[in-house]
Amino acid sequence: MARKYSEEEVKAKLIRAVYQLAAAEGIEKVTMRKVAEGCGLSTPYIYQCYRDLPALMTDAYLRSDMEVANLMHVVRNLHMPGINKRQELEEASWVIWSLYWEYLMSDSDKAIFSWRYYLSGYFGAEVQEFRKMYYRDLMNFVNQVGELYGVSSSVKLHALVSNIIDETATTAVKMHLGYIDKDALTPRLVYQSAFSLMFHL
């Protein structure tokens, strides 16, 4: 008798198939049929969990984004209380960033999917609002840096946060795809590039 999967187990299988397909073939080549075949489930299983492909894609992206946000939340609470010196702040920045970098480098399929989704037509205003909410901890951190460094309040926090996230993710994806030799850049150099706007404003 075939094992019956829970809804969360089915979603996990579908999302992993989406990651693999998007990484291997490009996000525009992902279809419901390919997703079903990729995880060994019949197409009706998908529609029990998601109304359509955009809903599946968006859930896959937001779950990954939430994992990163939760990671940053934990790290920020551990390292940020009581910090009031520039050196301490830069050290905390390195710790937070390093964990994000390790997350990106640990799962190439997920990292490539997330970046391709971000650049695709699937990424719209609603997803952007979720992203702002998920990265509130990082935005608060950037604001703390700004206050310590005397950054003008007119500087857009979201732009700074996006630069950190996007610069780091772009480099990781290029490494996974072979566009950048993984030995050509040290994590410290990638970090310095990602945080260059924040520490030199």
Describe every region a protein language model picked out.
Residues M32, Y61-N70, R76:
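Short, basic, alpha-helical segments at the C-terminal edge of helix-turn-helix-like DNA-binding modules
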Residues R3, R116, E147-A194:
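Hydrophobic/aromatic-rich alpha-helical bundle segments in the mid-to-C-terminal region
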Residues S98-M105, F113-Y122, S196-M198:
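Helix-loop "lid/cap" segments that line or gate small-molecule binding pockets
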